[in-house]
Amino acid sequence: MSADIRFDSLKTIVPAVSRETADRLIAFEDLFRKWSKAINLASPSTLADLWNRHILDSAQLFPLAKEATRWLDIGSGGGFPGIVTACFLAERSGGCIDLVESAGKKAAFLRTAAGHLHVPARVHSARIESMWEKIETPQVVTARALASLGDLFTLAEPWLSDGAKALFQKGRDYQREIDESRVGWSFDLVKHPSAIDQASVILEISNLRRKTD
């Protein structure tokens, strides 16, 4: 797939994207493929369609909170959506994203990617719970393929209960997760259909509160 084709496909997701951002994302794809030969950054079965399955899928989050400058990605793994978001924030004055990843090798990759791409990302090689008091409440919290919705609420509660909103990417079982999480939590919800996978959604969560008996 040529750079021009990648750029055109990216514009279908983020119409106002610049060529500079597209070039960063293409460079990230190349770096990701190189590191994937040494460490497991993503399921090998998805690498053949890395641009669509991971990069475009992650890129669709940014337009949902494009005015936000302070982001947090938990369980960042191989950089989806964290590094992808950082590529967009690179052209935003004052923009920054914190990436939290407990696996040391993946955190090392994230640091390498952030430096190589010159994007505003701070990488924390730590468990999410250990960062509750260390990372200031962002405007947006993201997570992808990390945990059930209820568990995500527990992990992100200190930030979401302090005014941050969440953009959580979920697959075909999303409605069951929503129903189960409402047992212990109250929250406002907007469901955005995925532009990449018809069975998936992006859950926009705000005003999270833990229910009390």
From Swiss-Prot:
Binding site for S-adenosyl-L-methionine: 75, 80, 128-129, 144
The protein's Enzyme Commission number: 2.1.1.170
Protein name according to UniProt: Ribosomal RNA small subunit methyltransferase G
Swiss-Prot/TrEMBL keywords: Cytoplasm, Methyltransferase, rRNA processing, S-adenosyl-L-methionine, Transferase
GO MF, one annotated term: rRNA (guanine-N7-)-methyltransferase activity
Family membership noted in the UniProt record: Belongs to the methyltransferase superfamily. RNA methyltransferase RsmG family.
Gene that specifies this protein: rsmG
Catalytic activity: guanosine(527) in 16S rRNA + S-adenosyl-L-methionine = N(7)-methylguanosine(527) in 16S rRNA + S-adenosyl-L-homocysteine
One term under GO cellular component: cytosol
UniProt lineage: Bacteria, Pseudomonadati, Pseudomonadota, Alphaproteobacteria, Hyphomicrobiales
Domain of life: Bacteria
Function per UniProt: Specifically methylates the N7 position of guanine in position 527 of 16S rRNA.
Organism field: Brucella canis (strain ATCC 23365 / NCTC 10854 / RM-666)
InterPro entries listed in its UniProt record: rRNA_ssu_MeTfrase_G (IPR003682), SAM-dependent_MTases_sf (IPR029063)
Gene3D superfamilies: Vaccinia Virus protein VP39 (3.40.50.150)
Location in the cell: Cytoplasm
Main location: cytoplasm
